């Protein structure tokens, strides 16, 4: 799915109402049902995938809003997680190999990030784990800006790692 080109509903209005209706054990109105059906189609696409590849930049230490929007749309009760009063939140998706390629202007691998914090990696790890995907390998690429030599070295390192991962992906 290309999050910049494919349709993603805004997570508001009827789709938001549908989420909380389902969490509260209430039925949907017609408008809520229609809105939830869109989220369901997107979540089913993920549920049926044998493997997942997420390629994203790091923006302001986090993820782009479109990736966050996709996570909000697919993280729905009864589709990708459920709630049990005795056990809490439980994932509904089966685990599958997942690779996250994360490009950043800074170097978060060797510590040359000048004290900045990578908030994208822990967020994505937890968001995916919450719905059942824990076999996640992160491939950081950075720096992507600045002097040519560190950029070249980062690209080569990421390429080597991706070649290794591809053999079993």
Identify the residue ranges that each predicted region occupies:
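Short, well-ordered alpha-helix to beta-strand connector turns
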Residues: 49-50, 95, 133
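Gly/Ser/Thr-rich active-site loops/lids in small-molecule metabolic enzymes
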Residues: 73-80, 122
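Glycine-rich phosphate/pyrophosphate-binding loop and the adjoining helix
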Residues: 111-169
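Amphipathic coiled-coil/heptad-repeat helices and related helical stalk/stem segments
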Residues: 38-39, 85, 120, 158
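N-terminal beta1-alpha1-beta2 submodule of the flavodoxin-like/Rossmannoid cofactor-binding fold
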Residues: 1-76, 160-169
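Residue-level signal for short, function-critical loop segments
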Residues: 58, 104, 142
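Hydrophobic/aromatic beta-strand patches that form the interior of the parallel beta-sheet core
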Residues: 1, 53, 99-101, 137-139
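Short, glycine-/small-residue-rich phosphate/pyrophosphate-handling segment
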Residues: 82-130
